[in-house]
């Protein structure tokens, strides 16, 4: 059984017991979080597709940890001008373990 849900402006395909990284959520590690924007649920041949969300669909997960991703370098370079600008960015994430899928 798997589901597709939306969190942080992105869609994630998850199965029960899977660990996934999401955009940062303000929930303490060890607590439970519920996602109700479920777009699709599949249980073998039984597939429910929402318009846009599945009615009564819910994905529950336990927050494992918070952290920051790898650094992404941003470089702006102007040729022949002796001008270069360099910056970096590390995005915050929340790692969750999927504990249940309900449809």
Curated annotation (Swiss-Prot):
InterPro entries from the UniProt entry: bL21-like, bL21-like_sf, Ribosomal_bL21, Ribosomal_bL21_CS
GO molecular function: rRNA binding; structural constituent of ribosome
Residues forming coiled coils: none
Claim: Ribonucleoprotein is one of the keywords in the record: yes
Pfam families in alphabetical order: Ribosomal_L21p
Keywords (A to Z) from UniProt: Ribonucleoprotein, Ribosomal protein, RNA-binding, rRNA-binding
Superkingdom of the organism of origin: Bacteria
GO-annotated biological processes: translation
GO CC field: cytoplasm; ribonucleoprotein complex; ribosome
Record-stated family: Belongs to the bacterial ribosomal protein bL21 family.
Function: This protein binds to 23S rRNA in the presence of protein L20.
PANTHER family: 50S RIBOSOMAL PROTEIN L21 (PTHR21349), LARGE RIBOSOMAL SUBUNIT PROTEIN BL21M (PTHR21349:SF0)
Subunit-level organization: Part of the 50S ribosomal subunit. Contacts protein L20.
Name of protein: Large ribosomal subunit protein bL21
Species assigned in the record: Alteromonas mediterranea (strain DSM 17117 / CIP 110805 / LMG 28347 / Deep ecotype)
Lineage: Bacteria, Pseudomonadati, Pseudomonadota, Gammaproteobacteria, Alteromonadales
């Amino acid at each position: 059984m798997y589901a597709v849900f939306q969190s942080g402006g992105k869609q994630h395909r998850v199965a029960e017991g899977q660990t996934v990284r999401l955009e940062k959520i303000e929930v303490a590690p060890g607590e439970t979080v519920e996602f109700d924007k479920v777009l699709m649920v599949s249980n073998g041949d039984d597939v429910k597709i929402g318009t846009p969300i599945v009615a009564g669909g819910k994905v529950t997960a336990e927050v494992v940890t918070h952290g920051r991703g790898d650094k992404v370098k941003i470089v702006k370079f102007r040729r022949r001008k002796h001008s270069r600008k360099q910056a970096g960015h590390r995005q915050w994430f929340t790692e969750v373990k999927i504990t249940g899928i309900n449809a």
